[in-house]
Regions:
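A short beta-strand element within beta-rich, extracytoplasmic domains
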Residues: 80-93, 153
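Short, surface-exposed beta-strand/loop patches at domain edges
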Residues: 156-223
């Protein structure tokens, strides 16, 4: 009959093995959590896209308005290095650029209910003149390491003269019901997406109360 100490020792090591196994499984769980099958297919085929706001379904277009910052939220489930943003222009813009044209990435400060700029692209007057219906990308000035959490991608358009407004490819389903889905279960100061008017540059901070709910549903890619 085994000695009591031997039994206790065996149970101890067996328990440790189970804990180690569980920790390894949990460590991989964050990779499983992000379940956008479209993105997983892109990655499996060799794309550098890590996350996307595109939920699938039909697509449409939303025309940009001068001096308007468009904000679209995305949840990032694990620590990631983001180098830039991909987007698709369905109608190429024809305009004379002024002020700032580009993209910013904002973290969310839930304590103070505000967005904080953490990365941005260089000012590029031609960014919204990308070829129509083609995938375009824009790098941040420096790749940014982000932790798990909610983030907002901001798209800013400025012009001094315009022939044709750039039209961004968007999710048609989201565009239709965004005013509703922007606020489900949330306080009025929190939105899944929206816009801020009279913006000549990317603000370093944006209060929740400054954001207006709009129907956009931007299709964006984080790589």
């Amino acid at each position: 009959m085994p000695e009591t100490n031997d039994v206790i020792s065996h149970l101890y090591y067996d328990l440790n093995d189970k804990i180690d196994s569980l920790e390894q499984r949990l460590a991989g769980a964050e990779d499983i959590y992000y379940s956008n099958s479209y993105v997983e297919r892109l990655k499996a085929l060799g794309s550098d896209v890590q996350y996307s706001t595109y939920p699938g379904g039909s697509i449409s277009g939303t025309a940009f308005t001068d001096n308007t910052l468009y904000l679209t939220s995305i949840f990032i489930p694990k620590t990631s290095i983001i180098s830039g943003i991909g987007y698709i222009i369905s109608t190429q813009g024809s305009y004379t650029a002024d002020e700032y044209n580009g993209i910013g990435l904002y973290s969310y400060d839930s304590t103070n209910e505000k967005l904080v700029l953490i990365a941005s692209t260089t000012n590029d007057g031609d960014i919204w003149k990308a070829a129509a219906n083609a995938y375009a990308t824009k790098d941040f000035t420096t790749p940014i390491t982000v932790n798990s959490g909610i983030y907002y991608v901001g798209l800013l358009y400025n012009n001094s003269a315009q022939v044709t407004a750039p039209i961004l490819m968007v999710s048609a389903g989201q565009t239709t019901i965004t005013p509703l889905i922007n606020t489900i279960g949330l306080t009025t100061a929190k939105l899944v997406g929206g816009s801020v008017n009279t913006m000549n540059n990317l603000p370093s901070e944006i209060l929740n109360t400054s954001i207006t709910s709009v129907t956009i549903g931007a299709i964006l890619y984080l790589y």
